[in-house]
């Protein structure tokens, strides 16, 4: 059994990006161990593959996965790269350091991404050297903590914006001085071209969307965080599927731009939708190994300011929450497949009311309904009955009005993928020729059934 050890950058987003990509690339792995190099205080991933050259295999798998994101990156309106031609921007990293041309203001990012992957393909040996235990060096120079991943290129501004000034232990990294007081300085992280290309391509692949709030640009990035546990091959496959579902939910729902406008609403909608898709398997996998409950799905949002980025509000969903939603759904009377179907209806109800609260002429009404939909979902998830009953009463009262119900059902049905429309049409409407109309009626029926069921349970 061959093993490889990958050293992770001590930057939250960069570390999560690497964990996400390594887990997704673990198709040949027997085990992944997420731990800490206690000598240097750096997070590491130990990869166990029953073949020679495990790191080569893992990196080729990773490159193949990144290739699959070409169309997604090309569709992104913008990405979190500072391309101004000025000192300190990301421009010099790519055009001078890697020789990869950044796109113009009106050009898409697909061509840049393709060129970046081409560079990465030709420099996989650099990546191996830069992320291996032997290739990472650290020390203190002129009061600055320096961490070198095989080269001298800066990382993207977004990644290093989470660097820090600190007196003392450098945020958990050990001061290499053996005597005297701790150094006062900055943490400076450098890498070779291969590592920079890998981190950049992975960041673009995991960028779910971009938009703006007022005049401020906002970027949404989804990642997975795993700390201090061992993951086996089939568990890695399960985690990859869970993350794929999470990422697709964020990307699909971000057309309504809820990730930054209503973080709580998006979190609840994502929790219930993920459960509807993977809840049955999550119960089995996590029930067998409770340690997996700690694994987190993270949505992070960032905005640029000058030559750096700052982290905005985001959210986290643990796999424990996903698995535990089964008992919560059973507590309000849903069993079998109904648990998963109803969870998806709740997710769409949250998103559709939030969307209408932004665009409908009766914004006040839909803001109240959105608040009640969130409270209902929260109460079910946490099994707190009182807010559940209050929210249910108000939702039931307003949705007796046919125009309100149909408006919500219209927006909710738009969230259903075209390829899955037939499976969402209820038996009562299977015979209708207009499939979208049949879907609309089915969605209205599902919403009413949900509320009637909960009223009876209450």
Kindly give the residue locations of the regions a language model identified:
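Long, contiguous all-alpha helical interaction modules
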Residues: 1-125, 129-131, 280-458
């Amino acid at each position: 059994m061959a093993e490889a050890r990958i050293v992770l950058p001590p930057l939250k987003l960069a570390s999560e990006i690497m964990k996400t990509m390594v887990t997704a690339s673990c198709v040949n792995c027997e085990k992944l161990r997420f731990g800490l190099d206690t000598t240097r205080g750096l997070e590491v991933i130990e990869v166990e593959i029953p073949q020679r050259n495990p790191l080569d295999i893992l990196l080729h798998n990773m490159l193949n996965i990144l290739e699959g994101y070409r169309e997604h990156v090309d569709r992104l309106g913008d990405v979190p790269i500072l391309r101004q031609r000025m000192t300190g921007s990301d421009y010099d990293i790519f055009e001078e350091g890697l020789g990869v041309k950044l796109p113009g203001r009106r050009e898409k990012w697909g061509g840049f991404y393709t060129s970046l992957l081409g560079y990465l393909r030709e420099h996989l040996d650099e990546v191996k050297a830069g992320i291996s235990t032997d290739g990472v060096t650290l020390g203190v120079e002129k009061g600055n903590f320096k961490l070198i991943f095989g080269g001298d290129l800066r990382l993207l501004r977004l990644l290093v914006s989470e660097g820090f000034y600190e007196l003392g232990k450098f945020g958990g990294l050990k001061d290499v001085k053996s005597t005297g007081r701790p150094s006062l300085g900055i943490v400076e992280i450098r890498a070779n071209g291969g590592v920079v290309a890998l981190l950049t391509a992975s960041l673009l692949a995991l960028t779910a969307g971009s938009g703006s709030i007022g005049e401020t640009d906002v970027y949404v990035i989804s990642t997975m965080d795993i700390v201090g546990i061992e993951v086996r091959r089939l568990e890695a496959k399960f985690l990859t599927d869970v993350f794929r579902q999470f990422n697709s939910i964020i990307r699909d729902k971000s057309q309504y731009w809820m990730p930054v406008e209503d973080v709580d609403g998006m979190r609840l909608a994502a929790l219930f939708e993920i459960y509807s898709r993977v809840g049955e398997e999550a119960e089995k996998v996590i029930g067998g190994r409770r340690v997996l409950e700690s694994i987190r799905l993270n949505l992070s949002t960032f905005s640029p300011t000058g030559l750096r980025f700052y982290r905005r509000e985001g959210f986290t969903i643990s796999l424990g929450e996903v698995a535990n939603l089964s008992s919560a759904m059973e507590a309000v009377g849903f069993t079998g497949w109904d648990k998963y179907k109803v969870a998806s209806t709740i997710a769409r109800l949250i998103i559709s009311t939030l969307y209408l609260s932004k665009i409908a002429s009766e914004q006040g009404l839909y803001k109240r309904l959105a608040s009640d939909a969130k409270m209902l979902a929260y109460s079910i998830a946490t099994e707190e009955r009182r807010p559940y009953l209050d929210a249910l009463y108000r939702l039931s009262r307003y949705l007796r009005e046919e125009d309100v119900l149909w408006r919500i059902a219209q927006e909710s049905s738009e969230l259903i993928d075209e390829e899955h429309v037939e499976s969402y049409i209820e038996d009562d409407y299977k015979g209708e020729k207009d499939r979208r109309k049949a879907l609309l009626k089915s969605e209205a029926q599902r919403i009413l059934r949900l509320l009637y069921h909960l009223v009876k349970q209450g």
